Each structure stands twice: as C-alpha cells, then as structure tokens.
C-alpha cells in the first residue's frame, strides 16, 4: 500500500499549482508597476519612427528598463528585416 501512496503524493494539488502561478503573476506585476508610465507610449512612438523608413511588425521593438541601485538603464532592441541585395 505504501508503494501506491508514494506515487499519489507526487501529484501537485490544484491549490498548490494555483498558488505558484499567482506568485509568478504578482512578481511580474511588481516589476511592471515600478516602471515608468511613459514606456508603452515611448515604444509606440519609436515604432512609428522606424516604420517611416522600414516595414516592421508590432513586436519588432522591445524596451526594458533595468535598475541597479541608483542607476537606470533603458534597453532598446529593434529587430529589422533582412535587406535583400
């Protein structure tokens, strides 16, 4: 009987899974909450400027703000399409 109980105890209960997922969501919200309000608008404006010159998708521009003590770094990544020669 103990052999079967061992395998049954390996499954996570739905409450535990829900708790872990909620912790991940709360952690992500805390990271985004501390970010400045202008980042989404900045990303949209940068995308519009890039689109004046190159056809790119919505997800071609990503902006991240990283904080390290009293220093903030704004990281901008733009994925440009390959230029065919």
Swiss-Prot record:
InterPro entries: MinE (IPR005527), MinE_sf (IPR036707). SUPFAM superfamilies: Cell division protein MinE topological specificity domain (SSF55229). Gene3D superfamilies: Cell division topological specificity factor MinE. Keywords: Cell cycle, Cell division. GO terms for biological process: cell division; regulation of division septum assembly. Pfam families: MinE. NCBIfam families: minE, PRK00296.1. Belongs to the MinE family. Prevents the cell division inhibition by proteins MinC and MinD at internal division sites while permitting inhibition at polar sites. This ensures cell division at the proper site by restricting the formation of a division septum at the midpoint of the long axis of the cell. HAMAP family: MinE. This is Cell division topological specificity factor.
């Amino acid at each position: 009987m103990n052999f079967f109980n061992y395998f049954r105890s390996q499954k996570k209960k739905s409450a535990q899974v829900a708790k872990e997922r909620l912790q991940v969501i709360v952690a992500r919200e805390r990271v985004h909450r501390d970010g400045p309000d202008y980042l989404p608008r900045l990303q949209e404006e940068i995308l519009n400027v890039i689109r004046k010159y190159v056809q790119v998708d919505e997800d071609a521009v990503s902006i991240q703000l990283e904080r390290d003590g009293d220093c903030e770094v704004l990281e901008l990544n733009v994925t440009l399409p390959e230029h065919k020669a």
